[in-house]
Curated annotation (Swiss-Prot):
It comes from Prochlorococcus marinus (strain MIT 9303). Belongs to the MQO family. GO terms for biological process: tricarboxylic acid cycle. It holds the Pfam family Mqo. HAMAP family: MQO. Keywords: FAD, Flavoprotein, Oxidoreductase, Tricarboxylic acid cycle. This is Probable malate:quinone oxidoreductase. Its cofactor is FAD. Coiled coil: none annotated. It catalyses: (S)-malate + a quinone = a quinol + oxaloacetate. GO terms for molecular function: 2-hydroxyglutarate dehydrogenase activity; L-malate dehydrogenase (quinone) activity.
Amino acid sequence: MAVSDVAGSQSRYDAVLVGAGIMSATLAALLHELDPELRLLMVERLQAPGLESSAAENNAGTGHAANCELNYTPLQPDGSVATAKALAINTAFERSLEFWASLTEKGKLLPQQFLHLVPHISVVFGDADLAFLHQRFQQLSALPAFASMQWSTDAAELAEWMPLVMEGRANAESVAATCIKRGTDVDFGLLTRAYVKSLQASGALELSCGCEVVHLHRLGKHRWNLDLKHSSGSRSVQTPFVFLGAGGGALPLLQRSGIPEAAAYAGFPVSGQWLVCSEPGLTARHHAKVYGKAKVGAPPMSVPHLDSRWIDGCRSLLFGPYAGFSSKFLKQGSRLDLLRSVRRSNFRSMLEVGFKNFDLVTYLLSELQQSEKDRFETLKQFLPNAQLNDWKLSVAGQRVQIIKGTAEGGRLQMGTEVVSAEDGSLAALLGASPGASTAVTVMLEVLQRCWSERMASESWQERLQKLLPSYGHDPNSDPLLLMQMRIRSNELLSFT
């Protein structure tokens, strides 16, 4: 993958994207499809794209479609479950599939390299959680987006869906599961690099790795200067648009930008670990993503799940994540990241969130104290016949949850949020899950905010309709449209 020589590169670009992860790569791909003449610069402090949060070993890779993640359908006081978030996430993932299908049709992506069809299963144990899962099944399966969802409490059928989970389990134990066969596993690191490779081949994108943004400031309306530091030297570049898509590193850069919209934000870093199995005899027998129910007080990223994964083309099983706390904002960051992010404008919000979420802090600290035996006992709740020597511990990526100052005080937010300058000259993506799976939808939001005139133009609207045939329509209110979207994606992405 070609990397530019900093000293010899040009200094003016139509857009500069900081961080070479799935978000920046998706935005670059969209911009190029909408206007092939745009000159784009992507800056990455590591030595290649997609090595931080987008790397397969650093995220769940589920292809989040809300098929199996129970935290997206919380139980309500009246006994029902909320479905709005699940529907929104499902729609966003269908849009990602739609975009990948279009680029595949153009010969720019090879889906078999990064995308695998894997059933998505939700499993619960015990009568109380069975009632919750059955309520979720009844409500979701009545919606077109989840109409293919299956329900079972039959031990023989469950053993077909997830043999390793059922083997060695007591017959008297209450177990229930739902299953959607059209689930996916996505290697977002490989997808990121595929985007970048295609963009470089077109001549539209300059990639600068091993390069950090040391300073950014406004030169005037719709004009930014970024000072870049590289092993081979330094330079300054100018652009009318900056996107900060650096994962946990986006918040410090947003703060350095000085835009008033950044003042209300802070970050709460959460770390994680996986147990990984590469034994062929086991990986060949588990073909599903099996999600359980999070412990009370646990953050969403700690929902236990056992996943079939393809990491750089090799099949493995991942179980976890085991949550923890680190003051780093990036896996390859500094332990001073959290301290350096404290500002007069966000200090009070950070304290308020700490007090309001003391149970969460306590939970994370308790997870840090877990021994190898403790982690293995958690695994055995999912896999009764698990053997310790088949599994090794691996560190997952860092997630920086959003702390936002509001009229009611500091609030801890799960999910992602786009923060942009009033004039649309700068945008940043903060937060975490569901993240990568919704990249196309989130980057369309960035374009609506920051490229609004171009987005409203006839030429861009025509290109958007070709790229995303469902653009401007809600498939949740049009079952025929949803069916057409899925038929097209299934065919072009070779879902069989």
